[in-house]
Structure formats: C-alpha cells, structure tokens
Amino acid sequence: MGTKTKKTLFNVDEQMKAIAAQFETLQILNEKGEVVNEAAMPELSDDQLKELMRRMVYTRVLDQRSISLNRQGRLGFYAPTAGQEASQLASHFALEAEDFILPGYRDVPQLVWHGLPLYQAFLFSRGHFMGNQMPENVNALAPQIIIGAQIIQTAGVALGMKLRGKKSVAITYTGDGGASQGDFYEGMNFAGAFKAPAIFVVQNNRYAISTPVEKQSAAKTVAQKAVAAGIYGIQVDGMDPLAVYAATAFARERAVNGEGPTLIETLTFRYGPHTMAGDDPTRYRTKDIENEWEQKDPIVRFRAFLENKGLWSQEVEEKVIEEAKEDIKQAIAKADQAPKQKVTDLMEIMYEKMPYNLAEQYEIYKEKESK
C-alpha cells in the first residue's frame, strides 16, 4: 500500500534554489579589464601586479612550447594549461613558501612557481623518476595522476600542519571531474570535521575530459558542495586573476586563523585538449563555445587592466616571452642530460630499506644493469 505525503511540507525547489543562490560568482575585473567590484579589490602593489602578469605570460609560453615539444616526441604526457592561468597562478600567488601544494596533473605551473626547477617539470612529463622528486625546499608532492586522490592527501597534510602548530596551509587542485569522485567528498568531510587548514580549488573548466559539467552533477555549482561538508564555499570568475587571488587570500587567512577549510570553485576553460594523448575537443564542444570563452581570456583582460594603469606594455611583454623561451631552451637541454632511467632507480627511491621480498629481484636487476 502506497503512502501519500503533503507536498506543501517539503519545499524542494525552494531549498535547491536557496542553496545555489548563496554562491554568486565573485568578479573584480570584467572581460574588458575594467574594475566592477572595487570593494573586493585585493591589496597588491604595482610590482606584485606586474609580477603576477609576468608569471601568466611566461606560463602561456611554457604551455605553447610544451605542446610543440610533445608533438616532436621530446615530451611525454602533457595536459595543456592555456586559459587556466588565472585559476592556477593567481591562486598560487596568494600562498607563502611554507604552504604545501598537492597538485593534479595539469598543475605543473604552480609547482614551477613554487620552486620546482623547470628541467624537472620536463622530466616529469617524460616519466623520469627525477621529475617526481621535489627539492627539499619545495613544499609539494608530485602531480597526482589518480583523479581526486589528492583531496584526501591534502586533508591529511593539513591536519598534520595543525597538529604541529604551523601557520601554513595545504592547497590542492582538481577539476570539475575530480569533484565527482568519492575522494573529493571524503577529503572535504575529514578536513571540515577537524578544521584542518586546507584549501580545495576546483578548476571548473566545463568538461571532465569529454563529459560536460551538467552531466556530472545535478548541483548548480561545485561551490555548494561545501555545504554538505560544513565548510565554506566560494565561486569565482576563474578567468579573473584578481578575483581568484582575493578568494584564495581570504581562504588562506581563514585557514591559518583556525577557521577551517575552504572550497573554491573557479569558472574557467581549457583552450586545448584534455591531454596531448589523442583527445579531440571538437568531438564534444562547439567552436562557438570555444570562441565565447576565448573572449574571457585571463591574460587579455589583465593586460588591459595593467595598461590602463600604465604598468604594462608590449615591449615589457616581449621581454617576458623571450625570457621564457630562453629558460625553456636551457631546461630542455638539462633534461636531455638526465641519466637513463633504470629499474633499480625506481626501487631505490621508493624504499629507504629494501623489503626482503624485493631484495633478491633488486640484486638481479642490478647485475643486469651493470653489464
């Protein structure tokens, strides 16, 4: 026998709308580079503004050159970053050196600006073990390949920071596809329960490889998923570097003051394929959509903003481009000199003390490699 309920008791539509309405998109610069939210303007000096722009231009060149090197067979796995410079670099710009980064595979630029030598970034793309070894002064893990797994790791690292009394944060990056993984919810829930100083950045570039965000989740925003974990959520224009910086700086301040983690959803777009491993974006998105997002380009709008303030010029930008090209040239040359990878290398870097069940295999490989 079925049951009947009084639907007037359950305001389903109103509840859903009310939740989504809490997460208005933060924007400071519009597509023309004009300030539309003076109250939210972050306190950045002229030199800081120019440095952020320099990093964005440099990283665009790095992306273009990396794609070219991949096509030449000189790089292996590569996930293009063009279009996401504001989401990646403006968020990183709000961090301190002692903060810990747990990136996804598209987030190599943040590692480079956090201190990872460029030649090691290229070695990571080539699958060389040296590319996964962070220098001791770089607080980061190598990029996570398993989608969403870094969320749980971030919760643990952040809790460790809290227990040690450190005034620093653990920040992680994933995409909208990562926000559909179980690890995403588990990590946020854990961090929220312990008020761990974590920042979860979801770069919503509209597609999990080829699956549009609308088919991944019924939620109107990714930011509202913070509600279930009892943490703070923000949605920002991910093509606006000032909005991304302001949101991240706010999240960091909350975290180090013991107020717990924050989920930041950046609305952004990747211009290229998901990776250079055969993905064809024309199969799942239209040229009109691509053109629409290219009109929002983060470098173009930030350039307009800085030029209006007299802080940037084509001459300055050309110097940055040439600097990037020269650095990349030298880094590739150094990466080419890396020793050939051996099986024993992988065993040695994995274990401080070789497990007994691998010791015999290790000796066998070592003998073979010595010949």
Swiss-Prot record:
Enzyme Commission identifier(s): 1.2.4.1
Source organism superkingdom: Bacteria
Catalytic activity: N(6)-[(R)-lipoyl]-L-lysyl-[protein] + pyruvate + H(+) = N(6)-[(R)-S(8)-acetyldihydrolipoyl]-L-lysyl-[protein] + CO2
UniProt keyword list: Oxidoreductase, Pyruvate, Stress response, Thiamine pyrophosphate
GO molecular function ontology, one term from the record: pyruvate dehydrogenase (acetyl-transferring) activity
Enzyme class at the top of the EC tree: oxidoreductase
GO biological process terms held by the UniProt record: branched-chain amino acid catabolic process
Cofactor: thiamine diphosphate
Induction, per UniProt: By acid stress. Under acid-stress, this protein is expressed at a higher level in wild-type B.cereus than in the acid-sensitive mutant strain NB1.
Keyword Ribosomal protein assigned: no
Entries under Pfam families matching the protein: E1_dh
Role, per record: The pyruvate dehydrogenase complex catalyzes the overall conversion of pyruvate to acetyl-CoA and CO(2). It contains multiple copies of three enzymatic components: pyruvate dehydrogenase (E1), dihydrolipoamide acetyltransferase (E2) and lipoamide dehydrogenase (E3).
Subunit: Heterodimer of an alpha and a beta chain.
Entry protein name: Pyruvate dehydrogenase E1 component subunit alpha
Organism for this UniProt entry: Bacillus cereus
